[in-house]
């Protein structure tokens, strides 16, 4: 059956968008952030001081202390049948960063560096190694930088320059089915 272009183009477009969203895993109900591999923002702050300082003043960071006290969050939680915002997976998945603390999964921060860039335990050492003991980001060779980026990404880091992976990760929370 042939549909007129005016009908088939939007249908194809919507089908493509649904397929893209499905491929991000947003309908799976969880994100690929493994609490056993989460570090914390301090680990990132060793090199990215200004970024971590900016994050600490951001809505993403302050979610940890502000959201559980928010009336809007309490109203939403009540409608969803959630009693404790910091312990229900529907909230934890997007609004907090969880890590292993004393052999239990616990929220340690709001939406952190690792929420966007992936749990760091598997890639942070490679990401922060510039070649040799005395090498810095300024003295690192282009070949080493390229290899460092590739190895970090293969280990789970989501770099800002990888727009598809970054957007797919963002949409994991910013587009939800409920």
Where are these regions (language model features)?
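N-terminal secretory signal peptides that target proteins for export/translocation
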Residues: 1-9
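Bacterial N-terminal signal peptides
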Residues: 11-25
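Sequence context of c-type cytochrome heme-c attachment sites
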Residues: 25-109, 114, 120-164
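Non-catalytic accessory/assembly modules
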Residues: 164-171
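Solenoidal tandem-repeat scaffolds enriched in leucines and small polar residues
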Residues: 172-178
């Amino acid at each position: 059956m042939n549909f007129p272009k005016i009908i088939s183009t939007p249908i194809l477009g919507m089908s493509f968008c649904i397929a893209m969203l499905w491929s991000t895993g947003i309908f799976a109900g969880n994100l690929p952030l493994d609490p056993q591999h989460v570090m914390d923002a301090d680990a990132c702050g060793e090199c990215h001081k200004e970024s971590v300082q900016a994050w600490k003043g951001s809505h993403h960071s302050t979610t940890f202390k502000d959201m559980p006290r928010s009336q809007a969050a309490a109203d939403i939680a009540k409608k969803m049948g959630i009693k404790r915002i910091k312990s229900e997976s529907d909230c934890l998945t997007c609004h907090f960063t969880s890590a292993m603390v004393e052999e239990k999964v616990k929220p340690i921060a709001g939406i952190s560096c690792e929420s966007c860039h992936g749990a760091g335990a598997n890639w942070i050492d490679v990401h922060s190694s510039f070649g040799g003991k005395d090498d810095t980001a300024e003295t690192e060779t282009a070949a080493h930088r390229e290899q460092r980026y590739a190895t970090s990404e293969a280990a789970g880091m989501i770099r800002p320059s990888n727009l598809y992976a970054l957007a797919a990760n963002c949409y994991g929370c910013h587009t939800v089915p409920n």
